[in-house]
Amino acid sequence: RQKMVAEHESYAEDLSFPVKPQKALIDCRKIMDKDDIVISDVGANKVWIARHYNCYEPNTCLISNGFATMGIAVPGAISAKLVHPDKKVLAITGDAGFLMNVQEFETAYRLGTNFVTLIFNDSSYGLIKWKQDMQYGHHECVDFTNPDFVKLAESFHAIGYRIEKTEDLLPTLKKAFQQDKPVIIDCPIDYEENMKLTAHLEQLMKTL
C-alpha cells in the first residue's frame, strides 16, 4: 500500500502535457469534498479512476464497470445532481463515451442541473486501443476526430472550457463548479500511460 500511495503522489506536481490521467485525478480529488459525487463513464478512464481516485464515503464514486455501458456519465450526473443538489457532481468520461449521450446536455440544461463533465480527450476509443495494443501489439480502427467541445457546450446553453496546459486544470475545475449551468471541460489526456501501466503490472506480477 505504501508503494501505491508513493506512486500516486509522485504525479501531484507533474506538469507534462497532455495531462497524465494520474495528475488529472489528483486535481479532481483536491476539488471534491469527501461526500461529493463522481460518476465514471466506461473506458480507459474508469481504470485510472479505480486506481487513482481515493474514496472516503459510500456511493461517492460510481463506476458502471463490467456492464460496459458507455455513455452513462452524463445521464448519471444529471440524476445525481437532481437527488443531491447540494453536492458537487463530476462526470468523468472519455470523448467516445461522452459523444454516445451528448444529447442529454439538453436535458441537463432544461432541468437546471449544474454539474461538471470532464472529458479525457484522446480522440480514440482508448480502452479498445489499449486492449488491441496488449493483445496484438498494434491497433486498428479506433481513432476518430472530435467536435469543438467548447462550442458544443455553448450550443446546448452550457459552458465550455478547454485545457491548454496542465497547470490550468485545477483552477478550471474550481471555476467550473462556481457556475450555475452545466459545464464541459475538454482535457487532452496522455494515454501513453496505459501501456506503461500494463508493463508495470506485468513486472509486479513477476515478483509475487
Where in the sequence are the language-model features?
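Active-site diphosphate/adenylate-binding microenvironment
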Residues: 1-75, 80
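Glycine-rich beta-alpha junction loops
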Residues: 42-46, 122-124, 189-193
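Thiamine diphosphate
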Residues: 47-125
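Short, hinge-like loop/turn segments at secondary-structure boundaries
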Residues: 55-58, 109, 133-138, 179-180, ...
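Active-site-proximal loop->helix
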Residues: 105-106, 127-135
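Conserved thiamine diphosphate
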Residues: 132-172
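Glycine/aspartate-rich loop-and-adjacent alpha/beta segment that forms the canonical ThDP
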Residues: 166-208
